[in-house]
Regions:
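Canonical Rossmann dinucleotide-binding motif of NAD(H)/NADP(H)-dependent dehydrogenases/reductases
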Residues: 5-37
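Active-site loop of short-chain dehydrogenase/reductase
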Residues: 10, 57-58, 85-86, 132-137
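A short helix-coil junction within the Rossmann-fold of NAD(P)-dependent oxidoreductases
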Residues: 32, 82-83, 100, 127-136
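The beta1-alpha1 cofactor-binding region of Rossmann-like NAD(H)/NADP(H)-dependent oxidoreductases
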Residues: 63-75, 107
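Hydrophobic positions on the long internal alpha-helix
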Residues: 75, 90, 120, 124-128
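Conserved catalytic-site loops of classical short-chain dehydrogenases/reductases
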Residues: 87-88, 111
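Conserved NAD(P)H cofactor-binding loop of Rossmann-fold oxidoreductase domains
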Residues: 93-98
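Catalytic Tyr-X3-Lys loop
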Residues: 103-123, 137
Length: 137
């Protein structure tokens, strides 16, 4: 258990929790006492869950396409079903699909990049906002 318990008994949604920064953030907030909702489309999110559980942490996974509002709503609904509230949303999902100079991107590739990196943040904020306003978070 970490000395810093700033997330003790807080329900925290972490998007993009399967890999990279999102995985690291999820592990850290769990280590600091959070009840973590691990949101990702990838099956690798199960590995993040297993690591948290191995350290006696409290977490669930929600596999959802966060490029859609329905996917974001599914994450919020599951968090509320299991934990009854949401205290913190950490929007992390996104990242480059193609690594090349921007001038080489086609219009379709730019649209896919925006869909992957911008819309998940917007949809998750929109989905969680009514609950956070209600609970003055």
């Amino acid at each position: 258990m970490a000395l810093n318990q700033r997330f003790l008994n807080k329900v925290v949604i972490v998007t993009g929790a399967a890999q990279g920064i999102g995985r690291g953030v999820a592990l850290q907030v769990a280590n600091e006492g959070a009840q973590v909702v691990l949101a990702d489309l990838s099956d690798y999110v199960d590995e993040t869950l297993a690591e948290i559980k191995a350290k006696q942490g409290d977490a669930i996974t929600v596999k959802a396409n966060l490029e859609t509002f329905a996917g974001a709503q599914a994450v919020v609904e599951k968090a509320l079903e299991v934990y009854g509230r949401i205290d913190v949303l950490i929007n992390n999902v996104g990242g480059a699909i193609w690594m090349k100079p921007f001038e080489e991107f086609s219009e379709e590739e730019i649209i896919k990049e925006v869909n992957r990196s911008l819309f998940p943040t917007l949809w998750c904020c929109r989905a969680v906002l009514p609950e956070m306003i209600k609970n003055q978070k």
